[in-house]
């Protein structure tokens, strides 16, 4: 199967798995008489379970993604989504919604396979284009879903439960699509062959001391983790890779947190609970995200030169908008700010994915993508535990957004610092080059003078 065909199937998978019209209305649905869960229970007892389960599930997921070569992990994501929406449709009470969030956390962790799968089948020269395609496909799925959801709610054609039933049907369909994804050619055979050669050599030396199947398995395991260690050591010396990975982790942490709790803020600002425009907001947000994900592919930006400056400016903008959200009494301001924040993130995470993939020297994209996401979710878990969880500060929703604003201000400060170092380094290098040039000219002039005399 050609890489174009595989990319098309992967894009179809991404579009259908994101076709979940109920997503923008999750908080109104859970707080409605249908589920009868209070807002305080939602953001202190239910939603934190997604963050914690996501963090714990990421560890095996980003290791197994490369070992199992992507497809099985994609299947786990699909099954996790089915379990999530089955619980949303049929479940009752706080504890079942907690299980629902755990299931969604596992599915979210497995999503790493979807975004790294493409790099195992596409030549390096196509990374930027392929990244744009798969991210745009996922965003287009959201676009259609959110538009449909808002239309059905605004026209009173259906209620929140029907939206969740439609979402359940979509995630069941995506499980079938996942079956048709081709398996990526495994590197395990090559490693196992090398391990088998080692075992055969050991057998010649001491037949009684070797058990071939076990030795082969242990040799493969050692070989794989040795490869991981070597890959991480190489990555730790790549400044460009570290820069983008740092932004990926820090920005994803903040944006995930905002996405998790923004509906709680909107709920507080909405005067009429029956007149909810969450779907419109997510529709516009997703349309912009899809456009920017494709548009950035056509921009000729020197990310090595201008990356720190762009990351600094955009993080500062996000910090200002989040503070505005925390102080506003108008839901339209909160809606608009959210759209700008997530659009910035969609655009830059596409650039980050392509730049990180470009810097990698092997097929361990699942490992590196997983490491970045794992750091993000660890930070988010800490943030959730301290700021949101009922066992710690348990801050009100507006104060939470003040904290998130301060968090992005810190991110902006970090990249401002890197930007200043970069400017100083360039200035210093330019001065050194100029001094060297002048010294060389003086030597040449002296040489000419001596030759003439």
UniProtKB/Swiss-Prot annotation:
**Where is it made, tissue-wise?**
Highly expressed in pharynx and posterior part of the intestine. Expressed at lower levels in the body wall muscles, head muscles, and vulva muscles. Highly expressed in the intestine of the early larva, levels decrease in the later stages of development.
**A Pfam family per the record:** Folate_carrier
| UniProt GO cellular component terms | plasma membrane
Stored Gene3D superfamilies = MFS general substrate transporter like domains (1.20.1250.20)
UniProt keyword annotations, A-Z:
Folate-binding, Glycoprotein, Membrane, Transmembrane, Transmembrane helix, Transport
Q: Which Gene Ontology MF annotations are present? A: folic acid binding; vitamin transmembrane transporter activity
Give the disruption phenotype, in one or two sentences.
Worms display defects in folate uptake, reproduction and movement.
Q: Name one GO biological process term.
A: transmembrane transport
* Membrane topology classification: Multi-pass membrane protein
What is the name of this protein? Folate transporter 1
Species this protein is from: Caenorhabditis elegans
């Amino acid at each position: 199967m050609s890489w174009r065909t595989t990319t098309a199937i992967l894009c179809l998978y991404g579009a259908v798995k994101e076709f979940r019209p109920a997503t923008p209305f999750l908080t109104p649905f859970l707080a409605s008489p249908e589920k009868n869960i209070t807002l305080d229970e939602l953001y202190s007892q239910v939603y934190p379970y997604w963050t914690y389960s996501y963090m714990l599930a990421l560890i095996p997921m980003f290791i197994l993604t490369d070992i199992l070569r992507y497809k099985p992990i994609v299947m786990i994501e699909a099954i996790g989504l089915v379990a999530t929406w089955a619980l949303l449709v049929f479940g009752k009470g706080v504890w079942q919604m907690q299980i629902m969030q755990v299931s969604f956390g596992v599915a979210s962790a497995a999503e790493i396979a979807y975004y790294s799968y493409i790099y195992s089948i596409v030549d390096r020269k196509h990374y930027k284009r392929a990244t744009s395609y798969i991210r745009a496909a996922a965003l287009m799925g959201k676009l259609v879903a959110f538009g449909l959801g808002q239309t059905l709610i605004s026209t009173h054609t259906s209620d929140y439960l029907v939206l969740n039933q439609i979402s359940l049907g979509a995630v069941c369909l995506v499980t079938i699509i996942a079956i048709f994804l081709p398996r990526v050619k495994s590197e395990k055979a090559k490693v196992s062959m090398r391990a088998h050669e080692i075992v055969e050599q050991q057998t010649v030396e001491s037949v009684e001391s070797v058990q071939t199947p076990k030795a082969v398995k242990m040799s493969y395991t050692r070989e794989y983790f040795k490869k991981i260690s070597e890959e991480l050591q190489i990555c730790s010396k790549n400044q460009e890779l570290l820069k983008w990975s740092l932004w990926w982790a820090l920005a994803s942490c903040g944006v995930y947190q905002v996405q998790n709790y923004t509906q709680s803020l909107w709920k507080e600002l909405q005067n009429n609970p029956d007149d909810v425009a969450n779907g419109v907001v997510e529709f516009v947000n997703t349309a912009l995200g899809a456009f920017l994900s494709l548009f950035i592919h056509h921009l000729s930006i020197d990310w090595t030169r201008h990356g720190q400056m762009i990351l600094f400016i955009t993080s500062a903008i996000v910090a200002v908008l989040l503070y505005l959200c925390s102080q506003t009494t108008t839901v339209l301001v909160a809606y608009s700010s959210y759209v700008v924040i997530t659009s910035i993130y969609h655009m830059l995470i596409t650039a980050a994915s392509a730049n990180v993939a470009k810097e990698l020297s092997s097929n361990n994209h699942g490992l590196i993508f997983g490491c970045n996401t794992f750091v993000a979710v660890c930070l988010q878990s800490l943030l959730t535990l301290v700021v949101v969880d009922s066992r710690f500060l348990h801050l009100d929703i507006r104060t939470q957004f003040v904290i998130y604003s301060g968090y992005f201000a810190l991110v902006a400060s970090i990249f401002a610092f890197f930007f200043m170092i970069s400017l100083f380094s360039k200035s210093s290098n330019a001065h050194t080059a100029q001094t060297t040039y002048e010294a060389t000219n003086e030597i040449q002039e002296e040489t000419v003078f001596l030759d003439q005399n």
